[in-house]
């Protein structure tokens, strides 16, 4: 029942929120967000397990599929859509499925989070296989749509993870690796778009970033698979070449063009003083890891 969930309780520090000054409201919200950061830090072992599941899925050709309803689903979508431009992934590699479909991005879809059959249909629609990993996101930890999605994923042999903001979450029962961030009562009672949402976003950032590092999408701390789809990103790509190799801006531009806009290929070309084809071959042999390709 909802009344037993910590995220649904009244926060003792904000019982008189309507009587506070603007500055006092901002201060208490900032303090509560600090608590969310601490709560996430206590779940690093569990988050690490999820990252390992995701890396394993990617290595066998599988996908990462986030499933959620409301704010949780939208946060999953936010993380998913940032992966192609940041890491050069195919849009299908990291996906998000929202209860209620695309309409739920901008408005509430009545009854969507309770539709267990829709969760199964939605996963079938994207062709879920045992090679994939499904991560269910639900602040309450009990959203029927998410529970159903994880249950179905386990039935077909896919790896599963979960992210909840309450202890003893139902979704944890269907997860190979379960994260339970105890964020506690919200500034606005029950409004889990606040602390719980902040905590979920931090965890999603960790999962996608650490997983991409684990499959060679990063060299040093540079986004070497960045897709330069606009002028800002093209300049960033060239700056990465300058910083990673020590070449001049003019040389960076030349190598960038010779490497067909592929930053990691250009890095190997510069540091190994080789042509495009040899650099590509080195990267292929190194499974995409720049550091290994340079050895």
Curated annotation (Swiss-Prot):
Catalytic activity: N-acetyl-D-muramate 6-phosphate + H2O = N-acetyl-D-glucosamine 6-phosphate + (R)-lactate
Highest taxon, organism lineage: Bacteria
Pathway the protein contributes to: Amino-sugar metabolism; N-acetylmuramate degradation
Purpose: Specifically catalyzes the cleavage of the D-lactyl ether substituent of MurNAc 6-phosphate, producing GlcNAc 6-phosphate and D-lactate.
Family, as annotated: Belongs to the GCKR-like family. MurNAc-6-P etherase subfamily.
Record note on quaternary structure: Homodimer.
Protein known as: N-acetylmuramic acid 6-phosphate etherase
Organism encoding this protein: Geobacillus thermodenitrificans (strain NG80-2)
Gene name as annotated: murQ
């Amino acid at each position: 029942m909802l009344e037993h969930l910590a995220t649904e309780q009244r926060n003792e520090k904000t019982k008189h929120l309507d009587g506070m000054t603007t500055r006092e409201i901002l201060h208490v919200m900032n303090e509560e967000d600090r608590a969310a950061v601490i709560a996430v830090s206590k779940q690093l072992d569990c988050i690490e397990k999820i990252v390992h599941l995701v890396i394993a899925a990617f290595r066998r050709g599988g996908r990462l599929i986030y499933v959620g309803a409301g704010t949780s689903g939208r946060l999953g979508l936010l993380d998913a859509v940032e992966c192609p431009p940041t890491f050069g992934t195919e849009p299908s590699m990291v996906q998000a499925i929202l209860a209620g479909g695309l309409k739920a991005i901008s408005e509430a879809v009545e009854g969507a989070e309770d539709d267990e059959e829709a969760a199964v249909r939605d996963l079938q629609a994207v062709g879920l296989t045992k090679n994939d990993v499904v991560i269910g996101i639900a602040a309450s930890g009990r959203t029927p749509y998410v529970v159903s999605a994880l249950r179905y994923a386990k039935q077909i042999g896919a790896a599963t993870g979960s992210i909840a903001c309450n202890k003893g979450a139902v979704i944890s029962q269907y997860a190979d690796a379960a994260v339970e961030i105890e964020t506690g009562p919200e500034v606005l009672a029950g409004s889990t778009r606040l602390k719980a949402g902040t905590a979920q976003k931090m965890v999603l950032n960790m999962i996608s970033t650490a997983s991409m590092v684990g499959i060679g999408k990063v060299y040093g701390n540079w986004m070497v698979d960045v897709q330069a789809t606009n002028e800002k990103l093209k300049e960033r790509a060239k700056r990465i070449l300058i910083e990673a190799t020590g070449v001049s801006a003019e040389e960076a531009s030349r190598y960038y063009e010779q490497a067909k806009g592929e930053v990691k290929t250009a890095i190997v070309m510069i540091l190994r003083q080789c042509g495009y084809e040899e650099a590509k071959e080195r990267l292929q042999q190194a499974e995409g890891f720049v550091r290994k390709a340079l050895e």
